[in-house]
UniProtKB/Swiss-Prot annotation:
Modification type N6-acetyllysine: residues: K128
GO cellular component: cytosol; mitochondrion; nucleus; protein-containing complex; TRAF2-GSTP1 complex
Gene: Gstp1
Listed name of the protein: Glutathione S-transferase P
InterPro entries xrefs: Glutathione-S-Trfase_C-like, Glutathione-S-Trfase_C_sf, Glutathione_S-Trfase_N, GST_C, GST_pi, GST_superfamily, Thioredoxin-like_sf
Listed SUPFAM superfamilies: GST C-terminal domain-like (SSF47616), Thioredoxin-like (SSF52833)
Residue numbers of Phosphotyrosine PTMs: Y4
Gene source species: Rattus norvegicus (Rat)
N6-succinyllysine modifications at: K103, K116
Amino acid sequence: MPPYTIVYFPVRGRCEATRMLLADQGQSWKEEVVTIDVWLQGSLKSTCLYGQLPKFEDGDLTLYQSNAILRHLGRSLGLYGKDQKEAALVDMVNDGVEDLRCKYGTLIYTNYENGKDDYVKALPGHLKPFETLLSQNQGGKAFIVGNQISFADYNLLDLLLVHQVLAPGCLDNFPLLSAYVARLSARPKIKAFLSSPDHLNRPINGNGKQ
């Protein structure tokens, strides 16, 4: 029996970074897929702490909130920096990823048709901090923090990949980010995950927009 269970919709959404992390770390997990019809019936939603998914089970521990799940796995699998200073930087990066992910979610679910052009125009300003962070860490040739991968790397990689779908070429003026995406995507287990039918057949978002 896999030690982890992901309860989520049949989309990448806020769970693909967690799935990518688990795959890269050689962990197995069980998926409990919740269709929108089942969700709208309300019985499952009423049992969820915040009335939302994902839900994540690690043995007898049940977690909600995608970033809490990532931080838990970061602590338990050694993906949280080598010391307190690096852990603080990992948290900072992940909060920056969350800020941009929220902007992306608002665009996708509330203002896609009218807001996409303005969003894409503003995107370089939102990507620049991550390029800066890479430049400050071993010349951008390593990870986003330190010399070992962290949960924030998986979250950032997933966010950059979905933005490359939204706005192809969005990383063209960010050579360090472009190389970072290529480098992490080439890690054998991440490469296998990204080319797997499970990943490829999952829509990025629940409304079909990307």
